[in-house]
């Protein structure tokens, strides 16, 4: 039995002028979420969704590609200005930020919202390579 083709509706354009870019850069991956000022998601992307697998997800180039993809989707909804919130210790922080700036967004502020433990949980042991 043949399956019926499912029609996927394209999301309606929201026309939002300002947004917040949340760049979450871990040691293994980089995720970019662009939301409106209230925090409702407009677009998102990650190094994994861009087709990178394994250790290639943690590269600055993968973060740049993910930021360009999320930025392109956000521009379809009319986003022009961004506040950037960077979180995490990963290598994709700066390259994702540069990619958003190169995509034509007017970046108004950059905040580092990495949570810092006040002597909380014990960190993972040091790697011996």
UniProtKB/Swiss-Prot annotation:
Gene Ontology cellular component annotations, sorted alphabetically: ribonucleoprotein complex; ribosome
GO MF annotations, alphabetized: rRNA binding; structural constituent of ribosome
GO biological process: translation
A UniProt-annotated Pfam family: Ribosomal_S11
Keywords attached to this entry: Ribonucleoprotein, Ribosomal protein, RNA-binding, rRNA-binding
InterPro entries associated with the record: Ribosomal_uS11, Ribosomal_uS11_bac-type, Ribosomal_uS11_CS, Ribosomal_uS11_sf
Family affiliation: Belongs to the universal ribosomal protein uS11 family.
UniProt function note: Located on the platform of the 30S subunit, it bridges several disparate RNA helices of the 16S rRNA. Forms part of the Shine-Dalgarno cleft in the 70S ribosome.
Quaternary structure and partners: Part of the 30S ribosomal subunit. Interacts with proteins S7 and S18. Binds to IF-3.
Protein name in UniProt: Small ribosomal subunit protein uS11
Annotated gene: rpsK
């Amino acid at each position: 039995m043949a399956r019926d083709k499912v029609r996927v509706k394209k999301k309606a354009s929201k026309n939002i002028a300002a947004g917040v870019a949340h760049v979450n850069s871990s040691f293994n991956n980089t995720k970019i979420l662009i939301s409106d000022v209230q925090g409702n998601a407009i677009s998102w992307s990650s190094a994994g969704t861009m087709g990178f697998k394994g250790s290639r997800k943690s590269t600055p180039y993968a973060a740049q590609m993910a930021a360009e993809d999320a930025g392109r989707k956000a521009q379809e909804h009319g986003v022009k200005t961004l506040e950037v919130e960077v979180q995490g210790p990963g290598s994709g922080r700066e390259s994702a930020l540069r990619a958003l700036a190169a995509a034509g967004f007017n970046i108004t502020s950059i905040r580092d919202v990495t949570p810092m433990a006040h002597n909380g949980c014990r960190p993972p042991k040091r790697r011996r390579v």
